């Protein structure tokens, strides 16, 4: 087979970024026996439940995991600056990467760096190795990032003017429709050190040989065509559709959930889940409960306890969910609904009884839902999720809106949040779960399921794109 070489993958900390990076790594080594991949792992102090996922892959040929996490003392010292902690945490691992490479005898073919790990381009350059970016979000968000990077750096525009602006809409390359300023990600409009660091990273994307995007041509044709900055490789949907994952549920917990779903009619259950960081205060939980009960639909609800005020932590589990639910709710919805803690999301979305997904619109969750043909009702919380919601509802027609402009502070700043009323939630659920000809969204989601599957098969658009990437990587060593 010729020269053998090693690709170095450096994902950002956190399960969503790690798992999608590892899934693309698996695709690459399955396509070309000349390549092996070392995944360098940086773990945040908070537990993202990734260890069982890594262990499940420990025997995969030509795929190696190396923990390069800095010591607790270094990590704790960095945590004192909340605003720049994440980027500084990644930068603190540069010497660890150098040490790994110095002790490795591999023939290096390139670095594949998470979108937040551009500081590692410096290390790649030191070793005279090509770099690629793995952009874990979608093409529309990449187009927005490049547009705002250009506004800020080339045209000296103070983009904070769009926050609470009288200008309701702006034009952004990658979007067919005018874009509402109220849906702009916070990173696009604030002037913090964190935002500067983020756009410095976007600038550095242009130093690399190409950008892998977790999307596919049939899903985002307009956004992909708008990206002319450099080589773009749409390689998605890259999702973990197996049983292994975050490893938060015991086998018995998952079996109990699946058994309950087995007893429900096809496409009859609305599934509510808001990602690894998603939780709500008691008042909002009660509004959701009222909406579910009034809608009459069967439901499976991942309900998790918010972290303590002022703490950057993952949500926890309730000892008794009755403490936050309307009195008698559990009894009145017995047999119709089931409340769970952490959700085995793939096992649920792949089940035929699930007919709709109320989601925070994290991109991995969106791709999982579309991979199984499940329509979405949008309820974004943070990061670029408001933009994802807008794209799904207005650009692609693959979702209905509960909210698109909802924002929840998850960094412990205790900023006030809106309460979404039960009427608004119920209306969105009814649209999502409507039967037959009334539900154009469901029809489109089923069509996108087929297109997403075809994209990854031999002859498909993402299969071809991944092949071009592998050719480029191999050219680095030939």
Label for each model-derived stretch:
Residues 1-478:
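Glycosyltransferase specificity loop/lid
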